[in-house]
């Protein structure tokens, strides 16, 4: 259900803008997207898990806010990020 430390480190390395970057919006969105994908898979087998569904909605909202921030700061960076992650919008 949660992502492994190795997978998280791989995402950080892939989306980091510089060495040691763990807090940039790109990294945060990538990690959130991975967690959202894992929870979405969880719901295929556990349709009535409403406590986790609330957590999923919270993660989706947090990702949306980060994406809106990136879009406001640099639209080209936003387009590149959603293309790399395969997100709609």
UniProtKB/Swiss-Prot annotation:
Origin superkingdom: Bacteria
Keywords in alphabetical order: Ribonucleoprotein, Ribosomal protein, RNA-binding, rRNA-binding
Alphabetical GO biological process terms: translation
Gene3D superfamilies: 6.10.250.3130, S15/NS1, RNA-binding (1.10.287.10)
Protein family (similarity comment): Belongs to the universal ribosomal protein uS15 family.
Stated role: One of the primary rRNA binding proteins, it binds directly to 16S rRNA where it helps nucleate assembly of the platform of the 30S subunit by binding and bridging several RNA helices of the 16S rRNA. Forms an intersubunit bridge (bridge B4) with the 23S rRNA of the 50S subunit in the ribosome.
The protein's assembly and partners: Part of the 30S ribosomal subunit. Forms a bridge to the 50S subunit in the 70S ribosome, contacting the 23S rRNA.
Protein name: Small ribosomal subunit protein uS15
Provenance organism: Brucella canis (strain ATCC 23365 / NCTC 10854 / RM-666)
Lineage: Bacteria, Pseudomonadati, Pseudomonadota, Alphaproteobacteria, Hyphomicrobiales
Gene: rpsO
């Amino acid at each position: 259900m949660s992502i492994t430390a190795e997978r998280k480190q791989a995402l950080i390395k892939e989306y980091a803008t510089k060495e040691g970057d763990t807090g940039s919006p790109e990294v945060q969105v990538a990690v959130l997207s991975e967690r959202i994908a894992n929870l979405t898979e969880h719901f295929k087998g556990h349709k009535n898990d409403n406590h986790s569904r609330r957590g999923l909605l919270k993660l989706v909202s947090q990702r949306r806010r980060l994406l809106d921030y990136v879009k406001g700061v640099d639209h080209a960076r936003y387009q590149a990020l959603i293309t790399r992650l395969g997100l709609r919008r």
